[in-house]
C-alpha cells in the first residue's frame, strides 16, 4: 500500500501525522544559548507559501527494508535544471579568471569541471596555491598500521541523492524564518550546479501538505536511512539541515565537553530530539569505503553534530581533535604525520602507540573499528562551533540561514577550490555580516589541499 501523493494522506502502515506540538514554554531553551534565529522578529520574516512543487522530495524507490510496509510515490517534478542554469549564468558573469563548469552535464568519464576522472590533473588557484588531485583506491596510513585500516575518497562520479530538512517551527514560540527558504535555495543550487536530480531528493519542511514530508523525528530518521541505503563507492550523498540545534548531557562518554549535540524535529515536544550519536549511527556508520556524504548543518551547537573526529582550522591543520573519540588509538599522532607528508612517521606513531596501549595490532584494529573514524568519505560543513549559535539572516530581503547562504555564495564565486580554500572563503563571506565561525570536519584525515567535489 502506497502512502500516496502529497495531500492524499496516509495508507495503512504509515501511522498518523502528529498534531503541532504545544508552544515552547521557554524552559526548553536552557542549552540553546539563544538558539538559532533569535533576530529581530520584525525583520525579513518568511511568510510560508504552499509548496509550488507538490512532488518535490518524493521517494522514488523503496525505503530501507524495515520500512517496506509503504513507500513514497513520486509526484510531478519541475523541469530539470542543467549546469548552465541561473547560477551558471551568474558564474560566467562574475568569475573572470576562474575555471568554469561546462554548460551541460559532464560526459561519462569526466568530472564536473571537464577533466577526465583519474587524469591526475592539478591546478593552481588563488595565487600559487596548488590544488591536489583526488587519489583513487584505499588510502592507508602506511606499513605498520593496524592491519586493514584505511579509507577511500569518492570522486563523486556515481549516483547522487540528497536529503534537505528545513524547519521553521511554524506557530511555535521559537519560530524561525529562513529554514524553509534554505531547502529551496540548496535544492536549486544542487540541481543547477552539481547534477543532482529532483527525483533523487527528499525535502522535509513543516509547510508540507503531505504528512510524510513533515520533518517529524520519525520522518527524519526514515529519510536518513533512505539517503544511505544502497550507496556504492563514488556515489555522492548530500544532507542539509536547517533548524534548531542544542545540547544535552552526554550519556556515553564520547564528548569532550560532556554534552551531546542534538537537532530538534518539528515534533520535539512530544517525540524528543535526535542526538548526534544516533545521527552518526544512521548516516555515517552504514557507509562503505568510497561513498561521499557531504553534510551542511545550519543550526546552533552544530560543530560536531555528525560526531566526526577530525576538525580542521583555516590553516588546514587539525584544530580540535575529539580526543575521547580517538583516545589511545594512535590515530592523532599518525594524522599529524599525514598532514606533514611524513608517511613513515605516520605509520610508526600509529603502530607504536596502538601496540603499547592495547598489546598488539589486531586488538588495536578491533578497537579502532569501534571509534568514530570511518572508511567512508564523510565531510561536514557546520554553521557554528559547538559553543556558538547560528544566525537567522536576512539576505537580499529573503530570510535564510547564514551558513547555507555563505556556502552557496562561496562556491558560486569560485567553484574550483580546495577544502581549506573553501573553508576560508565561507568564513570570509560570513565575516562580512556575522561573528560565527563555521568549521570543517571529516570522518578520516583528509588532504585539505585536495579539490573539493560533491
UniProtKB/Swiss-Prot annotation:
InterPro entries, sorted: Caspase-like_dom_sf, Metacaspase, Pept_C14_caspase
The active site of this protein is located at 244, 300
Q: Hydrolase as a keyword?
A: yes
Q: Name one GO biological process term.
A: apoptotic process
Top enzyme class of this protein? hydrolase
Superkingdom, natural source: Eukaryota
Segments of skewed composition (Low complexity): 38-47, 59-80, 88-101, 109-120
Region called Disordered, residue ranges: 1-129
Q: Which Pfam families match?
A: Peptidase_C14
Q: Which UniProt keywords apply?
A: Apoptosis, Hydrolase, Protease, Thiol protease, Zymogen
Per its record, what are the GO molecular function terms?
cysteine-type endopeptidase activity
Annotated EC: 3.4.22.-
Q: Give Gene Ontology CC terms.
A: cytoplasm
Q: Where is the composition biased (Gly residues)?
A: 1-16
Role this protein plays: Involved in cell death (apoptosis).
* Family in the record: Belongs to the peptidase C14B family.
> Which protein are we looking at?
Metacaspase-1A
Gene coding for it: casA
Amino acid at each position: 500500500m502506497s502512502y500516496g501523493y502529497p495531500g492524499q494522506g496516509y495508507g495503512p502502515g504509515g501511522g498518523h501525522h502528529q498534531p503541532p506540538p504545544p508552544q515552547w514554554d521557554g524552559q526548553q531553551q536552557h542549552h540553546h544559548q539563544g538558539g538559532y534565529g533569535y533576530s529581530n522578529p520584525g525583520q525579513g520574516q518568511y511568510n510560508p507559501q504552499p509548496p509550488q512543487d507538490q512532488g518535490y522530495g518524493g521517494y522514488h524507490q523503496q525505503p530501507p527494508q524495515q520500512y517496506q510496509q509503504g513507500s513514497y510515490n513520486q509526484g510531478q517534478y519541475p523541469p530539470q535544471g542543467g549546469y548552465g542554469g541561473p547560477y551558471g549564468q551568474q558564474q560566467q558573469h562574475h568569475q573572470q579568471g576562474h575555471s568554469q563548469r561546462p554548460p551541460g552535464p559532464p560526459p561519462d568519464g569526466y568530472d564536473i569541471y571537464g577533466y577526465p576522472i583519474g587524469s591526475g590533473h592539478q591546478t593552481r588557484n588563488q595565487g600559487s596555491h596548488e590544488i591536489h588531485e583526488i587519489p583513487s583506491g584505499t588510502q592507508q596510513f602506511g606499513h605498520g598500521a593496524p592491519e586493514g585500516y584505511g579509507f577511500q575518497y569518492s570522486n563523486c562520479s556515481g549516483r547522487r541523492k540528497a536529503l534537505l530538512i528545513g524547519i521553521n517551527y511554524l506557530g511555535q514560540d521559537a519560530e524561525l524564518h529562513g529554514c524553509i527558504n534554505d531547502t529551496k535555495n540548496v535544492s536549486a543550487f544542487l540541481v543547477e550546479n552539481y547534477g543532482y536530480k529532483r527525483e533523487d531528493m527528499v525535502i522535509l519542511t513543516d509547510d508540507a501538505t503531505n504528512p510524510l514530508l513533515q520533518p517529524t523525528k520519525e520522518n527524519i530518521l526514515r529519510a536518513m536511512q533512505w539517503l544511505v541505503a544502497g550507496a556504492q563507492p563514488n556515489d555522492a550523498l548530500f544532507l542539509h539541515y536547517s533548524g534548531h540545534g542544542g545540547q544535552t548531557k552526554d550519556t556515553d562518554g564520547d564528548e569532550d565537553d560532556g554534552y551531546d549535540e542534538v537537532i530538534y524535529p518539528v515534533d520535539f515536544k512530544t517525540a524528543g530530539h535526535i542526538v548526534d550519536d544516533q545521527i552518526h549511527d544512521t548516516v555515517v556508520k552504514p557507509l562503505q569505503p568510497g561513498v561521499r556524504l557531504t553534510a551542511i548543518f545550519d543550526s546552533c551547537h552544530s560543530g560536531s553534530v555528525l560526531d566526526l573526529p577530525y576538525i580542521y582550522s583555516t590553516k588546514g591543520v587539525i584544530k580540535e581533535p575529539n580526543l575521547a573519540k580517538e583516545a589511545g588509538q594512535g590515530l592523532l599522532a599518525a594524522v599529524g604525520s599525514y598532514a606533514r607528508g611524513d608517511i613513515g612517521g605516520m605509520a610508526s606513531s600509529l603502530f607504536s602507540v596502538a601496540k603499547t596501549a592495547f598489546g598488539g595490532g589486531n586488538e588495536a584494529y578491533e578497537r579502532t573499528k569501534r571509534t568514530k573514524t570511518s572508511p567512508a568519505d564523510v565531510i561536514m560543513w557546520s554553521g557554528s562551533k559547538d559553543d556558538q549559535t547560528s544566525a537567522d539572516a536576512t539576505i537580499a530581503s529573503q530570510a535564510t540561514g547564514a551558513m547555507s547562504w555563505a556556502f552557496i555564495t562561496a562556491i558560486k564565486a569560485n567553484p574550483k577550490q580546495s577544502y581549506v580554500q573553501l573553508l576560508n572563503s565561507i568564513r570570509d563571506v560570513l565575516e562580512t555580516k556575522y561573528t560565527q565561525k563555521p568549521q570543517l570536519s571529516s570522518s578520516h584525515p583528509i588532504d585539505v589541499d585536495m579539490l573539493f567535489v560533491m
